[in-house]
């Protein structure tokens, strides 16, 4: 830490001083980072107590004892914007000292439960269904109002969909036409509302409910299907840690790390449920930190997709991420040599694909793969005639002629990945990934007891994860240094 200029990260501290003298921010930063290196995750109360009773913390704080509120303000207000830069500079200092190889990056992800109520879900599809039901109710109400206004020539326009601003204009026009004043409305038992008051209040209630649905859909966004009411950034996901034992969804964040020589080189926090969507943001963050892409990004089958393989090709990275059926392709000889798999169909001299019965497959059409950002297409082929085929029970599952979907580019990529990972170098990388990347999460969760997110909001969670990552790297550096001293 002595070789790093820490003052450049402490710019958010106000220049004016009121009350007692300010604690030294450099001492506070060192104390906070040491606390996360010492404990894995350190609460503010524990940090305050350690500054009173633990000699190491007392020395770092120069015998001062800030309160937990002071530490909380310092972390949330001063470190929030600069935590990634601190992470970068500390990593560069450690990597230069330890000669860390950043060309090999071992990637893994885990889902940590968020600090949110487990039953405070908001589902995007349910909200959309409720909104469309509300559209029908609004149309029915406007038809009633138009029937009431038929004598006047005034008409409320009906549509298939509505927005709150449009309803607000119609509500104001209705109140203006009848000179309605909410102060004159009656409520309570024994008071009878007029038909105009009923229409006004129903339209107003629909407007507020429509605004609520729009707010929920805006919070949810286009990239996820749920969120928690008590932490809008948390998404409901399936976790390995299931309290009720019924495979329920829990609010969580997807934490991604890239490990190099047992140090966390890059970390990221996402609300994606799948690891496939997290690969590109993690690589872009790595490039932002170090100015280049890793030559060998090694990951499990959760990351191997057409999009990610194309991304690796475009940025000069080798394909060392497994795909979904990698283990079955590598270990299951019966599956690999199954004659009824389309990959094993022979191609005759005319370039026509033929099944084990010798029937030709003819090209039908090309189909875009839904949700693929690179415009991936599949070619659909259909067998000329499957009637009376002796292999029909093993080859197909429907009474129709068999159809197969083929993406030759993706198939070629899978062959390249198989060759890479089944080589001696690939086997060593796979072994190292399971040791380093998964081992890092094992140390964080089991040894250092960091199993659940404490803060709320994506920015605060990202701050927390970077503090934990810095602490892990300092912890690893300390262990390696002590082992070298003992060996000497």
Question: What residue ranges belong to the model's regions?
Answer:
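Anion-binding and metal-coordination hotspots
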Residues: 21, 32, 40-53, 64-488
């Amino acid at each position: 830490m002595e070789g790093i200029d820490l003052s450049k990260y402490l710019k958010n501290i106000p220049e004016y001083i009121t009350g007692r003298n300010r604690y030294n921010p450099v001492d506070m930063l060192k104390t906070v980072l040491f606390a996360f290196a010492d404990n894995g995750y350190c609460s503010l109360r524990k940090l305050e107590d350690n500054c009173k009773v633990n000699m190491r913390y007392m020395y770092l704080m120069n015998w001062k004892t800030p309160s937990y509120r002071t530490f909380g303000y310092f972390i949330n207000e001063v470190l929030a914007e600069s935590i990634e830069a601190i992470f970068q500079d500390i990593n560069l200092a450690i990597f230069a000292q330890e000669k860390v190889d950043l060309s090999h990056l071992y990637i893994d992800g885990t889902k940590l439960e968020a600090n949110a109520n487990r039953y405070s879900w908001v589902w995007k599809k349910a909200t959309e269904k409720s909104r469309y039901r509300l559209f029908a109710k609004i149309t029915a109400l406007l038809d009633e109002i138009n029937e009431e206004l038929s004598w006047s020539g005034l008409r409320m326009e009906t549509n298939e969909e509505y927005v709150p601003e449009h309803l607000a204009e119609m509500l104001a026009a209705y109140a203006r036409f009848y000179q309605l004043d909410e102060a004159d409305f009656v409520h309570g038992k024994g008071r009878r509302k007029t038909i105009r008051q009923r229409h006004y209040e129903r339209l107003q209630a629909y407007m507020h409910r429509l605004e609520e649905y729009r707010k929920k859909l805006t919070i949810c966004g286009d990239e996820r299907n749920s969120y928690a009411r008590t932490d809008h950034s948390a998404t409901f996901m399936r976790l390995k840690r299931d309290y009720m034992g019924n495979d329920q969804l829990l609010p969580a964040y997807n934490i991604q790390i890239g490990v190099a020589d047992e140090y966390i080189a890059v970390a990221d926090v996402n609300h994606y449920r799948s690891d496939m969507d997290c690969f590109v943001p993690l690589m872009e963050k790595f490039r932002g930190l170090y100015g280049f892409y890793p030559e060998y990004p090694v990951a499990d089958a959760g990351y191997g997709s057409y999009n990610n393989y194309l991304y690796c090709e475009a940025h000069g990275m080798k394909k060392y991420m497994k795909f979904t059926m990698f283990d079955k392709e590598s270990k299951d000889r019966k599956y690999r040599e199954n004659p009824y798999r389309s990959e094993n169909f022979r191609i005759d001299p005319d370039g026509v694909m033929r099944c084990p019965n010798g029937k030709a497959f003819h090209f039908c059409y090309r189909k875009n793969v839904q949700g693929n950002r690179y415009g991936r297409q599949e070619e659909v082929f259909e067998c000329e005639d499957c009637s009376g085929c002796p292999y029909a029970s093993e080859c197909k599952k429907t009474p129709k002629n068999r159809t197969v979907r083929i993406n030759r580019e993706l198939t070629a990529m899978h062959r390249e990945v198989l060759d890479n990972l089944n080589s001696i170098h690939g086997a060593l990388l796979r072994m190292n990934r399971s040791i380093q990347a998964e081992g890092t999460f094992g140390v964080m969760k089991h040894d250092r007891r960091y199993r659940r997110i404490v803060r709320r909001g994506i920015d605060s969670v990202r701050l927390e994860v970077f503090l934990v990552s810095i602490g892990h790297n300092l912890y690893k550096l300390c262990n390696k240094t002590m082992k070298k001293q003992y060996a000497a």
